[in-house]
């Protein structure tokens, strides 16, 4: 039998699979009486431009650009016809390499209109990483500014495509020996002409009447199940994998994210300091806003805490997005108190474990009474679990929420067995949101997605009796100390209770006797400079298990924590830096790690869930998010 728990009134329900048995399995299915959409990204842009043509869709504060839905649609059509004029067709891959700019949005929706596939390229990539990105998916056209911050994009392209500098200025057609699919380089700079590069401002003027007719024909042929976006994802280590997402994947995920957040109910102005190249920015941000006819505010080309605070104040933003690190930097900015945040009533926190103390501050100081936590991965378009606004605040931050509508999820052991609720295992997801594949990586796709379409997230989670899930860590981040399993998130959550700790990250470092021991990176508040390592250990003694107390404590500054562009901490880099700083590079454990409470073999063969038959549609990492177990309100 099923027990169905309403979400948001009568809009959707959760199946808790409460079979008449003593042990309930860690499986949920997001039943819903709201149908999936069968639209393309282009369909939704045209619908928005028809319904609210004069409403502002995107605001880029730093560049002084404000565009309505009708204006964006017009610009997207000009951009698409320009690409068609250059010879691009349906299915061709178009790389977008750069920070948050209006041209990024035009590329996102313009390529979707024409049935082309946009490839998101990390703004921090250097020449070797760009080379891999171009080769892996066969990019035909690349769009980028001349550079950003310390990166010289034009020099990087010239480095891997030397033919570039042999071309005339302002001419971007290309035939490269190293990149046989590559044909055009388009540069976003009106002030200067570059050898081997078209000016973006010229490309959007190239389209002829014949090109416009062809665009209309191409648009009619685009299907919801066609790929629309390739997002390179490797978590925080390893070679990038091209997660291939369809219109159906991202349109529906954005739609149900917005419904659960209440965007379909009232006017919403979303502050998006997150990078557009990441799912948080381009699916939860721009596409979500488009589908629900709302407005996105982009404070700066990349995250700047002061710019975000100013944007909230000046644009009267109602919702703010961010990772915990972003919110910490915003709340602790010396000019934080200068601005008015009374317009804010909601926000999304995702990207890393969210400390209870931070959640409390977001509600009490920034006004996020409808704060919601999200969990998912790029491969799931991205959100799989999300808080429900009807839950009390203290319940919302105990977990990553409920399964999204129309999705299934299970927690399994290392052999694929669905575990009882309350036991830790790997989180699996199945449904419309699961990516099509990793582009041109059949073996890798088979490793991550089982034949019956269960996607292995690589995250360790526990399902509670009410069907919500808490993420306790990544399989690869698990610390095994003499057979005892230590989940970094648990130690981090405890240490965050210390009133003088502003940020903390836990990693494992090698130890001869135990195999691994705990190392803590700690950032103290300004007034806490006299705190010692022993003070931290004393804070832990008698409150957490002795084997979880950090052996090593490294006090760090704000800039010392290595972050990805999307705000995730690079734990693998922290581990390596810790070993060097502590002189542990040559340490070899004298014993093999033995199985403790529950140990994962990261390389183990992956299995679909077994022991229990899981039914459902086989249709078909942004966020490693969790919260603690304290109450939000004391």
What would you call each of these model-derived segments?
Residues 202-206, 317-322, 331-395, 408, ...:
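Gly/Ser/Thr-rich phosphate-binding loop
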Residues 86-88, 207-226, 230-272, 284, ...:
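Conserved adenylate-forming
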Residues 184, 479, 505-511, 519-523, ...:
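Conserved C-terminal "lid"/linker of ANL adenylate-forming enzymes
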Residues 125-132, 142-144, 320, 431, ...:
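AMP-binding/adenylate-forming catalytic core of the ANL superfamily
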Residues 251-269, 279-319, 329, 333:
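Conserved AMP-binding/adenylation subdomain of ANL enzymes
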Residues 2-10, 116-202, 526:
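Structural core segment of the AMP-binding/adenylate-forming
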